[in-house]
């Protein structure tokens, strides 16, 4: 009987030590400086889904010499720049469509790949849209981070 208590005690001690010494690999949305930059709840949901899959987008990236910001920016190791936009109802209006068209043209001319996902598509099949986005990102050279000590450069 004493042996059982010794084994149980050692197991508990090793478990507690493992919890203390092992770095957490889980994403904590309440402790993320990029997440707070998301403009709305749907962007936060997309951001959370990407982070849970270990992708690190830059949120609200300010395009140099322009007045607009990108919902999510990714920079591939191969030099490709990727703009992921989450489009709400405004983007379906004639004014929004025209503005997005001009913006997309500018971005593509300046070396960016633009990916747009509508709120309708996300609301009708969120996980499917995230899986499609992840597949596109992988195809373009963006892969999940394998580093546990990932450092994000903050943009001013």
Task: Please annotate each region the language model reported.
Residues 51-81, 95:
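Active-site metal-binding core of divalent-cation-utilizing nuclease and nuclease-like domains
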Residues 42-43, 68, 100:
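Amphipathic coiled-coil/heptad-repeat helices and related helical stalk/stem segments
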Residues 79-139:
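Basic, amphipathic alpha-helical patches used to engage nucleic acids or provide basic targeting signals
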Residues 59, 115-117, 146:
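A generic structural-conservation signal
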Residues 1-57, 144-156:
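Solvent-exposed, charged helical/coil patches
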Residues 40, 63, 98:
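Conserved phosphate-coordination/catalytic loops
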Residues 43, 60, 85:
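Acidic-residue sensor for enzyme active/binding pockets
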Residues 46, 74, 103-107:
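Hydrophobic side chains within alpha-helical segments
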């Amino acid at each position: 009987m004493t042996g059982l208590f010794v084994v149980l005690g050692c197991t508990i001690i090793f478990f507690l030590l493992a919890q203390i010494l092992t770095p957490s690999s889980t994403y904590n949305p309440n402790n993320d400086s990029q997440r707070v930059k998301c403009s709305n709840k749907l962007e936060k949901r997309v951001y959370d889904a990407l982070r849970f899959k270990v992708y690190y987008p830059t949120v609200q990236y300010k395009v140099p010499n322009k007045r607009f910001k990108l919902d999510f920016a990714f920079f591939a190791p191969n030099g490709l720049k990727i703009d992921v936009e989450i489009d709400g109802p405004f983007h379906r209006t004639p004014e929004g469509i025209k503005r997005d068209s001009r913006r997309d043209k500018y971005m593509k001319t300046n070396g960016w790949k633009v990916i747009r996902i509508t709120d309708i598509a996300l609301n009708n099949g969120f996980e499917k849209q995230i899986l499609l986005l992840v597949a596109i990102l992988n195809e373009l050279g963006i892969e999940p981070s394998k580093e546990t000590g990932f450092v994000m450069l903050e943009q001013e």
